[in-house]
Amino acid sequence: MADPGDLESRGKADSYSVAEKKSAPKKISKKNANKAKLEDLKKELEMTEHSMKLESLLSMYETSLEKGLSENIVARNLERDGLNALTPPKQTPEWVKFCKQMFGGFSMLLWIGAILCFFAFGIRAVRDTNPNMDELYLGIVLSVVVIITGCFSYYQESKSSKIMESFKKMIPQEALVLRDGKKITINAEQCVVGDVVFVKFGDRIPADIRIVECKGLKVDNSSLTGESEPQSRAVDFTHENPIETKNLAFFSTNAVEGTATGIVVRIGDNTVMGRIANLASGLGSGKTPIALEIEHFIHIVTGVAVFLGVSFLIISLAMGYHWLEAIIFLIGIIVANVPEGLLATVTVCLTLTAKKMAKKNCLVKHLEAVETLGSTSVICSDKTGTLTQNRMTVAHMWFDKMIVEADTTEDQSGIAHDKGSLTWKSLAKVAALCSRAEFKPNQNDVAVLRKECTGDASETAILKFVELSVGNVMDIRAKNKKVTEIPFNSTNKYQVSVHEQENSSGYLLVMKGAPEKVLERCSTILINGEEQPLKDDVIEIYNKAYDELGGLGERVLGFCHYYLPVDQYPKGFLFKTEEEQNFPLEGLCFLGLLSMIDPPRAAVPDAVSKCRSAGIKVIMVTGDHPITAKAIAKGVGIISEGNECEEDIALRLNIPLEDLSEDQKKSAKACVIHGAKLKDIKNEELDKILCDHTEIVFARTSPQQKLIIVEGCQRQGAIVAVTGDGVNDSPALKKADIGVAMGIAGSDVSKQAADMILLDDNFASIVTGVEEGRLIFDNLKKSIVYTLTSNIPEISPFLMFILFGIPLPLGTITILCIDLGTDMVPAISLAYEKAESDIMKRHPRNPIRDKLVNERLISLAYGQIGMMQATAGFFTYFIILAENGFLPSYLFGLRSQWDDMSNNNLLDSFGSEWTYFQRKEIELTCQTAFFTTIVVVQWADLIISKTRRLSLFQQGMTNWFLNFGLFFETALAAFLQYTPGVNTGLRLRPMNFTWWLPGLPFSLLIFVYDEIRRYLLRKNPGGWVEKETYY
């Protein structure tokens, strides 16, 4: 037991953690200190204040119940411990966030390209009197693209994490305390350890307090534990676990009923809420899968660019080019490899999907989270409100020795039961009179099930059920006016009220409560309207029914009544409920049972089934009771029919659990793990549970345990999605690869910690999100393969220009017209492509093996389709030059004469003279034709990019945005070359319409080639073609 001296030694240490041994001072780095603090916060809550004797507690804190703390001790404690407030975490400055968007990932590649362009232009400016401005224009355009895209991304993600601000909203503003024998109201931040505080209905608890006096106090712990029912408090120490014990109330939870006096035992960061706040804000969530994919893609593109650039630098030097010329070639090749429009395409594609998901009730806070959900392999789902409706409903009744399913439909069209039974009529009447819930006013036109009520969840469920089954409850209560009442308390576990009888001068006593407590006060039971002695055979039937309903995870209440004798209790009798009652609470007549449950949402079983077929493991993680959790898990299919837990096997074999053999234990594919088991669990043990069982339920879990479960799944290599709505979920939401908060029932804290918010709180919406996430990953692959394919016909002219000395077939500005002009809308249109039929039948992608950009994609884009496109471009180029007198064989090695400004009489293949100006005009016409041919072959590339496996004839052409993309790129290409002024500025020339035609056969060839490739993919799954070309 602690002594008073302990208090001084504590200082500001977190006394939840194990006390540290004194050692020689040791310098600890800030990083290590933060890591140690985080590890400490992850530990289970440890405290002894709830188990200490009250005298010892008062002595330790130098306080008393009569006078409270003295002002001297308050001042000392304030100086030592600081204010009762949460320490705000270090905020990332907005300019740092902006710079991350501007220079992170793909943007850096474009910045390097822009800098190289400016460098190349600088070399030209120093060397030439009239330098070519292409590199300068390209550098400027690249810079503008990065700045615009960076600003757009920053704007999209500006709603950054504000977790601690949400916690601040939960902090109570004022507290009523006892100091120097006087009750005073103070700012809650001024509360100190040892303060005696007074709490009443409607207050927010100002700190973690030990209850020392209590009158029916109930607190809403849902934000901390996930339990939707208000929890009663008491002065008794009832559990070793501080979260479970009744004599503690926690900082920022709400008092919903009664009054209490308590002693402050923890303030600020040391409170349970403070620990969760610091844990949530201290966790790093790491890079998203799509960010890692883009990083991987950058490595590939950079590797290819640098390899080609350096190779041709060496080749050009070996061929006798001047070193300055060779460096310009190097820069040109590297820049030509940069897909300038891809950053904007990826950002826009993710934004479009985010908007699509918002229409389906998934609000995405961070763009990259769109794809993360599609990569998810494990979903750790909360139970209350996500899998269930967060609305207690009467599910079953037991009367006349039968279990009957309750009909809670609005029009009473569900399963019918005998409403003519006199027992049922008595049970319904008593349920109506016992329920203290009431409908809020001005809701006459609202359906019963949608009406708002005052009262706790169970009372509300009874009120609505009786209203639907019998009729107007308020009329029943008005005709049977309440005379007196003994409220429910945690000791008696029942509630009693006495009512005037309708059309009679007598009184009716009614009771509801824990079935075993109600039954022990009864001597008779009503069966088929007749009162009969309560015999053993009836009690046995009752016990079986009680066990069955309890086994379904339902909350069971018992009901009884007693007609008070008129001669002993005449009209006007004064009933006493304090101390000794003057009316009987024994020898009552038992009526039956009502059982309630928070029912599963209708769409959830189908959603869980879809997850299973998509290879996603759904794990339930809840703060609720294991029996309830297991029942809901079975109801929604998380534990599927036929799969058993170890307890089920032992029950079926009728043997003790410990007697199960290893083989029998291994045959249990499902398991329900109590949070207590996770308290001191080693990583290896948790990993074994996660590996050995396909269907898992974690019940009675703390925030720290939820976090441990997420980390355990991530150790297995899983991409983890976590759903939650309470403050207790925020650390797990933050740590998960994608945190999904509830929009309706979710706390502000959980919403800020999450990456995505479900606007309808429905688990089925997550499955929709998974499908959209998988679809955008597929469609991003299609956009990238489409965009990268045109890189080869863009790079190869430059390489031919260097290697074979031909006139430049494609200019730098023309490349920009493709990457930032004609290719942009078609690439974005692929984001609208519908899912291929197998999208939710395949397993989640493996982040290590299944890359966004892999060798097969590069091989197809560069080595196959890209080569065909380059051939088409050169075919058109050579045709036009041949038509103008320069045969292909004559062009090789002609570059130095062609670009010589002083040579104005260059002879062509047929002996005609060409001035420098004439040559440049035909060169620009050839570049325009090359550009136009790329657009024509990109038609086929866009169409084949629609699917990765299916035939176009299976997929169809129903993507109207893509159809518009085909028209757009054609119209834009025509506009750029035929509009006076625009064509001059972009160094394009209007050309004969016949020169659009040479690319058409190649376009058809690309389409036929890829149809055959995909046909072979479908015919021989897993064969050579799939291994080499399926991207």
Curated annotation (Swiss-Prot):
Annotated family: Belongs to the cation transport ATPase (P-type) (TC 3.A.3) family. Type IIC subfamily.
Protein name: Sodium/potassium-transporting ATPase subunit alpha
Listed Basic and acidic residues bias regions: 7-23
UniProt subunit comment: The sodium/potassium-transporting ATPase is composed of a catalytic alpha subunit, an auxiliary non-catalytic beta subunit and an additional regulatory subunit.
Species for this entry: Hydra vulgaris (Hydra)
Catalytic activity reported: K(+)(out) + Na(+)(in) + ATP + H2O = K(+)(in) + Na(+)(out) + ADP + phosphate + H(+)
Function noted in UniProt: This is the catalytic component of the active enzyme, which catalyzes the hydrolysis of ATP coupled with the exchange of sodium and potassium ions across the plasma membrane. This action creates the electrochemical gradient of sodium and potassium ions, providing the energy for active transport of various nutrients.
Single Gene Ontology MF annotation: P-type sodium:potassium-exchanging transporter activity
Organism taxonomic ancestry: Eukaryota, Metazoa, Cnidaria, Hydrozoa, Hydroidolina
